[in-house]
Amino acid sequence: MKRFISTTSLRVLSNLNKNNNNNNKFNKSIVGVFNREFSSSNEGLNKVNFGENNNSSTTEPTKVLFNDSQFYQEDKYQGISKEPFSKEIVDTLLADLNPDDIEIKPDGLIYLPEIKYRRILNQAFGPGGWALKPFGPPVVEGKTLIRPYALYCLGRYVAESIGEQQYVPNSFISFATATESAKSNALVRCCKDLGIGSSLWDPIFIRQWKSEYATERWCENSKTKERRLFWFLSNRSENQLPYPWKESDFNQVPSNSSYSSSSSSINNNSNSSNNNNNNSDSSSSINQPQQETISYHQDDSSSPSSKITEQQDDSEDIDIDDVVPPQLKKYAGKTWRQLVADPKGLSYLQWASSSFDNAPKIKSQATAILEFINKSQ
């Protein structure tokens, strides 16, 4: 049966530059050019052109990404969907994952290590009962190394995929390591067709697993002082974030410039007769939520004044761990402490203190917290 077939050809051009000393040495610069050619007839594959070098009489043939002669032929798909595997194999492939085997990246993406896929394949088909066959050599396109693979189990075609890995020549990762990483990437993609780890793409399972086995924590960049929320395993033994990120206690209210916690007193406006007590209170920083209350006044003119201690009957206290009002939509569901810890939180408070004329209580709270932070610096 004749059909239209497209091929992806890779032209490798070699620029031969003679050395000034005429020692016949030359430098080769390899440039990959991808041309997608579509057949306009029923004769099958187009003929592959050869790249010519204007600087030299030597020529090199064009390499094809999928250069296996059987890549587009039916023989490649031997035994495809012929019959299902035995029940014993199916039970092994579709078994529930061990929650302890699942890992999570700082951005919240959960995954199963590649070695786990290999172990499941070995348990289902036995060592030697499956293989990942490459079709074509590894090719570097831009800053990515790619290579196509097909997965065979018990002599039957199962799935195919293109593995990829970021790679820059003369970088910290070698060509061999990048090729092996691309192979592992292709294996994981092929295993999806066998149902291995299919729950990792199920949104319901992802939410349930995160709620039980992962936690989100504040981390700080030790160089830029930027703060972000990263995901960790709940049962982790230590912080695994790479430098310059480190886990930070978001309970500490940062200053306006350095976002570091201030050790100034919460009760620094108390009576002068209790100086000794005030000195001991000043050592208690703002990372003690049960002692943090910010008092503010609200009058008809909507001009609140921040106080650190309870002074008058018409004042109200703000707990730094209270949830912010829902009108502050950007931080809805978060606490005042989390708002202040955010790098953009202070500017947001400044905006809120000058807005919300129709909600004087929110305006008063934002102003009170701003004044409290300024006094704590």
From Swiss-Prot:
* A molecular function GO annotation: DNA binding
Pfam families, per the entry: Mgm101p
Coiled-coil segments on the chain, per record: none
- Give the GO cellular component terms, alphabetically: mitochondrial chromosome; mitochondrial nucleoid; mitochondrion
Which keywords are on file for this protein? Answer: DNA damage, DNA repair, DNA-binding, Mitochondrion, Mitochondrion nucleoid, Transit peptide
| Low complexity bias: start-end ranges | 255-287
In this chain, composition skew of type Acidic residues spans 311-320
Chief localization: mitochondrion
**Transit peptide extent on chain:** 1-12
Q: Which compartments does it reside in?
A: Mitochondrion matrix, Mitochondrion nucleoid
Ranges where the record places region Disordered: 254-320
The answer on whether this UniProt entry bears the keyword Transcription regulation reads no
What is an annotated GO biological process for this record, any one? recombinational repair
The question of whether NAD is a record keyword is answered with: no
By sequence similarity, the record places it as follows: Belongs to the MGM101 family.
The task this protein performs is described as:
Performs an essential function in the repair of oxidatively damaged mtDNA that is required for the maintenance of the mitochondrial genome. Binds to DNA.
Q: What is this protein called?
A: Mitochondrial genome maintenance protein mgm101 homolog
> Native species of this protein?
Dictyostelium discoideum (Social amoeba)
